[in-house]
């Protein structure tokens, strides 16, 4: 009979009891039976248990992959996890009222932290393989997109990450059962999986292993329990042989007891943890013995200045030692400051403790190249400002590094404290720059850190006020330079309004502040570096506010370009930034030639990004070592101080176009013409070599297309390529007064197109009407007259002006196109002949010019001669032959030149 029908009813189960017993064989028997006869112990689990077990197994896999940083497998496991969670959603909605299980939120939070940690490690990311790097980007995007639906749950989890929910208790129970099952499998007995307890229900007693047989036989009647109790011996032993075999029920019972004990222990742990959470926060236990926090003073000790100073010296004596707890050191100093304030030990003692707190915060980060933590940064700003306010409020406190420790005074005024607030604020400024460099410039973190510049500048102002009251000239120059470096690159619109008279003349602007600070440094500084940096920053600030002549005069009078190569790298970077901004200023002030001269050194190298310290270009393997790359990264400028490289390149190319195109037209047939801009010339030539040129898309293509239009004298097409919607968005709208710049560009394009047109087509015209030229290029007649007059005066255009008729009369002094080509051809042929003769002489040598003409028979005679005097007769013969050959070659050259002149005259006559 089928096993399914064996327990159909009470009567059937009673009548077929023998048949059922015949199938209840133990797996541990000595004989193997078929699958139909072998007993299989099973547990009927709910859908929730199955789904949760699937989720926990995938989460375990993800954690294992994270440990070994196997990112591709982490990505595939994450995709499996999302699919498994989607399948479990109906169960979660029913059982958990739609609340996401906490263990799932924990997995998402851990995965997000892991991705952020790997992503922020830029050095480690470079060493990743191509597959890992690609998988990391994909995983980051998918996780960021996926966790948007769990933002509230994640935020609640991060507030209390150590709290565990009932669902996590179930997961722990599942994991413990899985571990026990592994133990049972070793003993040869197939384990029975215990079902975890349901959420929010009382724990039920674990059923014995033998009771599960009713589930295996699928006996659905409730009376089966009584039947099994009445026939214990018959159900336990199926045949006579099995009565005398070794019993396995004792071991199974022990295993069940073990499972029960483990579950009880787990519940007790969870209960204790919940009680501890109610009592207070967790404390991290240090490996080894627990280090107690040292007591500051004895209970009955009298707190006075010597005692506090001795305690301060004791705390700071551990500074820099190997096993010093730097966090504890900072906490002790803060506690000592509070004790000092409570007992009114004086402002001088408080200032001393403040300064030591600042030193301890700086010491916390052992690697000076890495930025400090944000919590320490906020603490540093607060302590620094507090110390400077105390110094400014008490004029009788003198704090200087020149004060010796034995001469410090804390009891009677004037108070002397050893310390250097200038060095502290300089380190503060450097740490601020490190924090900015560490952040992603396109993220909100960078904006948040940039807001701290207000507090940094405020701190610098406090230090500046203190040293203006009591400080040496050198100290004042150093703090002035720090303020200048936070001011020189910032644009002040009040400066231009003051120029136009829109604000009162007494209004103080950033230019006035820069003048005051820089002039003091020019007069009082005794170090070249501070003065040089102040001049460069001063020029940069003038150029930013269109003070072209002041900036140019400072450059010329300081002779910076002569000795800048001997400066340090940071000063050379500032010099490059100054030249770039000076070029932009010259361009805005219609000085195209000066703009080109300022930018040519930067752009001709092809590495303006590196020269301006705005990023590193990818190098070949051995061109830059890891140490050099690290040093260059430390020299990079923060993102908010960058100069737009596309704007810089566009200004350079447009300036080169306005200079180069008229020059090319004027020297079209000159074989020895020089290039004004090598970069622009290469761009133009590469475009001309292309067989098919489409419409321009990039900024460079727009400039090249405009140059081609200008060569034909078509100013309208040239202006449309330079000034259009796309170029306005990319380049011209970045200027302060963009409309004025666009008008200036259009005017220059008209003028240079006119000059190009006259150079190109002067041999076609006999005379040209000036009013028609003015109408063609939409320029005033006086302006056209002025342009042509300059060309005639500079001997660029061979023509004369006829004022009564307002025409330009062309003089045919230039060779025609055919004549120019013929002369060009003759020059090239001449050069070719000279080169061939030189090559022939190099290959032949002077073998046939020797005295013996290559005859080897005289070697014995020469060998017998006195070698001290040498073969003077042969040497004289060789010298005479060489002179004769040189005279013949010179005569041949003269004859060749005469023939060329005759050919040119013949061509002219024809």
From Swiss-Prot:
GO terms for cellular component: eukaryotic 43S preinitiation complex; eukaryotic 48S preinitiation complex; eukaryotic translation initiation factor 3 complex. Transmembrane segments: none annotated. The modification Phosphoserine is found at residues 34, 165, 176, 185. It is found in: Cytoplasm. GO terms for biological process: formation of cytoplasmic translation initiation complex. Residues 639-815 form the PCI domain. Residues 240-268 have a biased composition (Basic and acidic residues). Residues 188-207, 862-874, 895-910 have a biased composition (Low complexity). Residues 11-20, 162-186, 209-235 have a biased composition (Acidic residues). Residues 1-21, 157-279, 847-910 are annotated as: Disordered. Component of the eukaryotic translation initiation factor 3 (eIF-3) complex. The eIF-3 complex interacts with pix. HAMAP family: eIF3c. Belongs to the eIF-3 subunit C family. This is Eukaryotic translation initiation factor 3 subunit C.
